[in-house]
């Protein structure tokens, strides 16, 4: 019984761990399927299809966050790649309804990027460099960096107030552990 229980818990846990390969190494992400099941399901689905592989970090604001996930215009491996449009696209799937929680936007938090409409998240996400309490309960938190945050800190920073990156770093691959 104990062995079966351990196997079940380990399998359940491993299904919520993803590996994001960056140029400097691997980052482990723990997904919060209990807090944001629809956002986690979307993230996993796009990752399993390889749609995040090659996607750039198009918006990176030092001391705030690194944003990626535009699978339409931000995929450097795609014929549709257009850095000037990166950040305006998403997947072909419908937008997601918000799944706000009381989890604070602390350092390492993985959260869904969206427009001014709280129900407009699709494929884009951001990772916080430090606490951003002004985002709490306004953006859907769906995971956290549990290993390799120092690699997120190394992502090339953008310029100006919007944090646009001219020669951006990219996600090499994103897969379940």
Predicted regions and their residues:
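Cyclophilin-like peptidyl-prolyl cis-trans isomerases
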Residues: 8-177
């Amino acid at each position: 019984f104990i062995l079966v229980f351990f196997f079940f818990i380990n399998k359940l846990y491993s299904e919520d761990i993803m590996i994001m390969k960056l140029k400097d190494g691997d980052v482990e992400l723990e997904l919060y399927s209990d807090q944001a099941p629809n956002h986690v399901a979307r993230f996993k689905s796009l990752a399993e299809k390889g749609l995040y592989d090659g996607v750039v970090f198009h918006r990176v604001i030092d001391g705030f966050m690194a944003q990626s996930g535009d699978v339409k215009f931000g995929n450097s491996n795609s014929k549709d790649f257009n850095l000037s449009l990166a950040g305006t696209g998403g997947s072909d799937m419908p937008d997601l309804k918000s799944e706000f929680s009381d989890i604070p936007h602390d350092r390492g938090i993985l959260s869904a990027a969206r427009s001014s409409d709280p129900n407009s998240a699709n494929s884009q996400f951001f990772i916080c460099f430090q606490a951003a309490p002004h985002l709490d309960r306004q953006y859907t938190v769906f995971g956290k960096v549990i290993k390799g945050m120092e690699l997120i800190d190394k992502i090339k920073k953008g310029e100006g107030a919007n944090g646009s990156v001219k020669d951006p770093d990219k996600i090499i691959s994103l897969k379940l552990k």
